[in-house]
Amino acid sequence: VVVLGHIYVDAVFYNPVDYAEFTQGRRRLEDVRRAGLRSLVDTGATFPALPEDVVGELGLPIYGEAEAEVATGRERVRLALAIIQTEDRTAASYVIVRPRGTTPLIGVVALEQMGFRADPVTGKLFKGLPLMPLEKIKNTIR
């Protein structure tokens, strides 16, 4: 969906520990913590970003802090880890923890892992070859 030159996609963010247990057969899919969110594709962002309340609800592991360039300038940010799914593609990525109420973002690291290219003219994502194994993913998406 294109809104004023922006590309928005429906994405599902999963708790990576729950998701790993599911792929190993130790957890049911319905027990995997996840959030379906309308997310802005941001080709100027390296990593995805989620509001801190969503990070908390999903129980995403926090891996520390790093200096980062964000829309408001350079600042210290917290990094969490998540599994991200868009259509039939998935990625594992660090996620920048942003303030409550901010728009969820999908940056270039996750886009490239999923094999998506953004076309700014049409405002659409195009599928290329993903870095993540599709066969395993297809067997887990229901």
Residue locations for each model-derived region?
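Pepsin/retropepsin-fold aspartyl endopeptidases
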Residues: 1-142
